[in-house]
Design a protein with these regions (language model features):
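Alpha-helical transmembrane segments and membrane-interface helix-loop junctions
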Residues: 2-113, 117-292
């Protein structure tokens, strides 16, 4: 693993004086967007949860051991739950911070020797074709958990634990939206290092992620409309309507109608963005492409 660093001149230190910046949130700050800065600031804020977590852990250990000798209230179940709450919140926000600052774990055996343009292409593929679809999938899965937890007013498994567990599960779902936003901001920033980031390029070069997101939007919109306009009362009932069926494309090869509609909508959006692009920026290359 490598730690991001950046050398900058020291004010008044002469032409050769340099200082190394090792704070991941400050490395490359000049190229970060407002969205990037928001993610970094949230990461810095939630990082303070780790010292709090240490205090809670130490306090729980002390209470547990003192309780064994008859001193104090002993082990507190709510403090056990609190540790997971704090850890979960800090780590999930930290994932978005790591994506924005490129401070996640990476084995640099090959990557470190690549030219800047090749590095950016690998980064773009990893973010938009591998990581972002996974994050969107996690959001979709945890949405069901969060809604079920809210509906049942889920609490702790321990009578003395932290109840209202739906708060944590809802936060997990929202955190995946934050991670998705951080990934998109980083993707757009890196794309600008290679080429002018027209919207049609942003959508096309992130096709799996965009297609998946559009498909989910269509699926939930159609399910909601079905519940409102028909006798369907649940998502299970709504998804039994014809719009959610499969069609045969080839012998033995079926596809969901919602997936095909999402593909058509995605391609239409890309085409519209291409038609409305700023043609004066066609052919503009980013700094890393120029360096290649």
């Amino acid at each position: 693993m490598t730690r991001p660093t950046e050398a900058e001149p020291v004010a008044g230190g002469g032409s050769e004086a340099m200082v190394a910046i090792s704070d991941p949130g400050e490395v490359g700050r000049a190229t970060q967007t407002r969205g990037d800065r928001l993610i970094v600031q949230l990461g810095n804020l939630f990082a303070w949860l780790f010292p709090l977590l240490m205090v809670v852990i130490v306090a729980q250990v002390a209470l547990r051991n003192l309780g064994r000798v008859g001193v104090g209230p002993g082990n507190q179940a709510w403090m056990d739950d609190l540790q997971w709450w704090i850890y979960g919140a800090a780590v999930l926000v930290g994932v978005g911070y790591a994506v924005t600052t490129n401070s996640h774990v990476r084995v640099d055996i090959f990557y470190d020797g690549f030219r800047p343009a090749k590095k950016r292409r690998y980064d773009l593929f990893g973010l938009a074709w591998l990581f972002l679809p996974f994050v969107i999938l996690c959001w979709d899965i945890t949405l069901t958990y969060a809604l079920q937890s809210i509906a049942s007013n889920e609490g702790s498994s321990s009578p003395n634990g932290l109840h209202n567990l739906w708060i944590l599960k809802s936060f997990v779902n929202v955190a995946f939206l934050l991670i998705a936003a951080a990934t998109w901001f980083a993707y757009c920033r890196l794309l600008a290092r290679l080429t002018w980031p027209h919207w049609w390029k942003r959508l096309l070069f992130a096709l799996p992620s965009v297609w998946f997101a559009v498909q989910l939007a269509i699926w939930y919109a159609a399910a909601g409309a079905t519940i409102l306009l028909t006798e369907a009362e649940t998502l299970r009932d709504a998804t039994r309507t014809a719009f959610f069926d499969e069609v045969e494309l080839l012998p033995g090869q079926d596809a969901k109608i919602t997936v095909l509609v999402a593909l058509a909508v995605t391609l239409a959006l890309i085409g519209l963005a291409y038609a409305l692009r700023d043609r004066s920026k066609d052919g503009v290359r980013g700094p890393d492409a120029e360096a290649a």
